[in-house]
Amino acid sequence: MNTLDYYNSKTDEFISSTVDVDFSKTQDKFLAKLSPKAHILDFGCGSGRDTKYFLEQGFKVTAIDGSVELCKFASEFAGVTVKQMYFQDLDEVDAYDGIWACASILHLHYGELQDVLGKMMRAVKDNGVIYTSFKYGTFEGERNGRYFTDCDEAKLAELLKCV
């Protein structure tokens, strides 16, 4: 099973474990770095939890996810159309004030991460903000039906040097 198959087949299980998690402390730190009504790309929006929160705070949000089933749920939950798109297909330039990639791009292989981080840098406006999160460590591979690239400080610094 690949990662998208996992999310498409275990949608309800994933949603029930994430949609009600209070992430406002981290979300608010991110939002504090943006202008009011800034345009945010929720890059791998999952259940739509963060998209909904950002919209409720008055921000403009474009939300994408690779999973067809998560896009369906998130669209209804957040009240906006969530576009089904793969991270590798991001091709916009200077389009967003902020990019929120919460526990999403960690599903890419290390080599893909370099390319996608570069695309994110091109898609965010000058002085824009990018948030991303990884599981801590150096593991790369399949875990519980999904692919993960974990990062510690050294691995993340190495990745960021390449973009």
Predicted regions and their residues:
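Helix-to-beta-strand junctions that scaffold the AdoMet/dcAdoMet cofactor pocket
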Residues: H109, V124-K125
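A conserved beta-strand element that flanks and buttresses the S-adenosyl-L-methionine
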Residues: W100-A101
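Hydrophobic adenine-recognition pocket in adenosine-nucleotide-binding enzymes
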Residues: S104
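Conserved acidic residues
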Residues: D97
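Class I (Rossmann-like) S-adenosyl-L-methionine-dependent methyltransferase catalytic domain
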Residues: M1-D94, G111-D115, K119, V129-V163
